[in-house]
Amino acid sequence: MAKVALIQRELKREKLAAKYAAKYAELKAIAGDAKRSDEEREAARLGLQKLPRNANPTRQRNRCEITGRPRGTFRQFGLGRAKIRELAFAGDIPGVTKASW
């Protein structure tokens, strides 16, 4: 089980990314637009640097909803591999069966 502080930090990052999403996308578009002047593009890059670090969506980490484990998380379920196995064997995940060939 992950520390509560790590899980809370991820939630904080999600909130910040959502808060600044529109501004981040706008500045990214300006900074990458070759038709704009160099001054405008430089101003957009500086604007991106002034945003909080955790407003960048690439800093987010997918975690297991139950345990908070950061690695081995399946996007489809939002769970870690160990919990998927445990719940699938118990029959708690509809449509998931043990492989047989």
UniProtKB/Swiss-Prot annotation:
Q: Which domain of life is it from?
A: Bacteria
Listed InterPro entries: Ribosomal_uS14 (IPR001209), Ribosomal_uS14_bac/plastid (IPR023036)
Cellular compartments per GO CC: cytoplasm; small ribosomal subunit
| Pfam families membership | Ribosomal_S14
Record-level Gene Ontology MF annotations: rRNA binding; structural constituent of ribosome
Q: Which Gene3D superfamilies match?
A: 1.10.287.1480
GO terms under biological process = translation
Region: Disordered, residue numbers? 33-63
Coiled-coil annotation reads none
Q: Where are stretches of biased composition, namely Basic and acidic residues?
A: 33-44
**By its UniProt entry, which SUPFAM superfamilies does this protein fall under?**
Glucocorticoid receptor-like (DNA-binding domain)
Any idea which UniProt keywords this protein has? Ribonucleoprotein, Ribosomal protein, RNA-binding, rRNA-binding
Q: Which HAMAP family does the entry link to?
A: Ribosomal_uS14_1
- Which family does the entry's similarity section mention? Belongs to the universal ribosomal protein uS14 family.
Protein's job: Binds 16S rRNA, required for the assembly of 30S particles and may also be responsible for determining the conformation of the 16S rRNA at the A site.
Quaternary context: Part of the 30S ribosomal subunit. Contacts proteins S3 and S10.
This protein is called Small ribosomal subunit protein uS14
Query: What is the originating organism of this protein?
Result: Acidovorax sp. (strain JS42)
The lineage is: Bacteria, Pseudomonadati, Pseudomonadota, Betaproteobacteria, Burkholderiales
